[in-house]
């Protein structure tokens, strides 16, 4: 568990040090990554300009849940044009609606839209959402009484390493939990379940690996060949002339936002794959100084970018492979969910021909589409149960 963090997008919620290192390592060892096209965007990331790292940080869903309004650059409340639930629609629907408003040019000065809470009473908002009010104030916005600019922001990766229910992988001795593991959230994680997932499966992984270690008797010696390969990979940037690593990272973030982002189609995904391939090639000619290896942040940035490029390629190719729209993955050229009975998940692996994506059928072992585990007289929701 290395902490996922889709920071390869122009707007993202995780801190910049999160760089998908765990998934990149899994790829290099030949493990399968599942559902990598499923990138969740939080609809309301703070939009404060490119000059501040505050841009992209989350403004919590409780703001919309409490009755906050989303307003475009023409001062129009627009969410009911997209969904009957308005601002309380699911994350993916609200993110796509905001993205479409941006694409149509109905934007705020920084290029996003606004969230408005003032109609709920400034004093009430300031009391109920103290942390959010302070976060906005730090960037010059008055959440309680004014308008705050927001933008969809890459928040969570539902995909990850293929694991079983006890966190084991196809590589003996490797256990994966948290955001590095795929499958726990399907195609669309519910708010709050990220922490629960890490806590539950982190505990399971600890218990299982302890039990497995006892059965092994003795630990295996490290594979010297793999260690040599990883060392050789790590020192690659010292063989090229020092260059601007950050410039390449900005190119990656722009490519992923523009072509592999909230709304996708085949042309854009192919364009994104080409841009990623170009970045891979350019990385070979951009090095870092090796004069001081201790606390060499440029070296760290180079290795982090390599991991982000590796996983970005998987996301783009998995997105191209999935020709339907499920959860957080939306294809404008394939807007329908397709047959539920024929559901599948994608499996991406790195091989001799590069990244290859295949499909694996979903096995409905407990409940099938259209069926319910509830009895005929049982309420399906807590609201129904209370009536």
Where is each model-derived feature located?
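Glycine-/small-residue-rich beta->alpha transition segments that form the dinucleotide
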Residues: 2-6, 180-181
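Alpha-helix capping and helix-loop boundary segments enriched in small/acidic/polar residues
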Residues: 6-17, 54-58, 89, 123, ...
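Glycine-rich nucleotide phosphate-binding loop and flanking beta-alpha elements
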Residues: 6-7, 40, 169
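Gly/Ser/Thr-rich active-site loops/lids in small-molecule metabolic enzymes
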Residues: 16-30, 195-200
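An anion/pyrophosphate-binding glycine-rich loop and adjacent beta-alpha core
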Residues: 25, 31-142, 146, 208-215, ...
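Beta-strand segments within the central parallel beta-sheet cores of soluble alpha/beta enzyme folds
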Residues: 36-42, 148-149, 219-228
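Glycine- and aromatic-enriched mobile tails/lids
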Residues: 64, 71-80, 85-87, 98, ...
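FAD/FMN-dependent oxidoreductases across multiple families
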Residues: 130-174
């Amino acid at each position: 568990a290395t902490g996922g963090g889709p920071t390869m997008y122009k707007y993202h919620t995780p801190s910049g040090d999160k760089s998908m290192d765990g998934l990149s390592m899994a790829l290099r060892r030949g493990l399968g990554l599942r559902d990598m096209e499923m990138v969740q965007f939080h609809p309301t990331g703070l939009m404060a300009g490119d000059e501040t790292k505050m841009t992209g940080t989350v403004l919590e869903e409780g703001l919309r849940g409490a009755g906050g309004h989303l307003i475009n650059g023409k001062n129009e409340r627009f969410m009911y044009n997209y969904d009957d639930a308005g601002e309380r629609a699911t994350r993916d629907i609200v993110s796509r609606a905001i993205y479409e408003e941006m694409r149509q040019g109905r934007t705020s000065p920084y290029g996003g839209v606004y969230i408005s809470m003032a109609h709920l009473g400034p004093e009430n908002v300031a009391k109920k959402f103290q942390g959010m009010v302070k976060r906005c104030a730090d960037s010059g916005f008055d959440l309680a009484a004014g308008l705050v600019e927001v933008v969809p922001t890459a928040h969570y990766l539902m995909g990850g390493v293929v694991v079983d229910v006890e966190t084991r992988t196809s590589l003996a001795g490797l256990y994966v939990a948290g955001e590095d593991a795929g499958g726990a959230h399907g195609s669309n994680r519910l708010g709050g379940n990220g922490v629960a997932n890490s806590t539950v499966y982190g505990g399971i992984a600890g218990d299982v690996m302890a039990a497995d270690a006892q059965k092994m008797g003795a630990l295996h010696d490290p594979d010297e060949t793999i260690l040599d390969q990883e060392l050789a990979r790590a020192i690659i940037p010292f063989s090229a002339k020092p260059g601007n690593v950050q410039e390449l990272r900005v190119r990656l973030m722009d490519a992923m936002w523009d072509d592999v982002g909230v709304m996708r189609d085949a042309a854009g995904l192919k364009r994104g794959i080409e841009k990623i391939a170009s970045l891979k090639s350019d990385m070979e000619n951009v090095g870092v100084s090796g004069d001081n290896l201790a606390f060499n942040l440029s070296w760290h940035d180079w290795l982090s970018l390599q991991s982000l490029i590796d996983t970005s390629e998987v996301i783009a190719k998995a997105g191209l492979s999935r020709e339907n729209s499920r959860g957080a993955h939306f294809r404008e050229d394939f807007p329908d969910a397709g047959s539920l009975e024929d559901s599948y998940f994608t499996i991406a692996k790195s091989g001799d021909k590069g990244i290859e994506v295949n499909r694996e059928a979903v096995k409905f072992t407990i409940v099938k589409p259209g069926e319910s585990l509830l009895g005929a007289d049982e309420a399906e929701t807590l609201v129904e149960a209370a009536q």
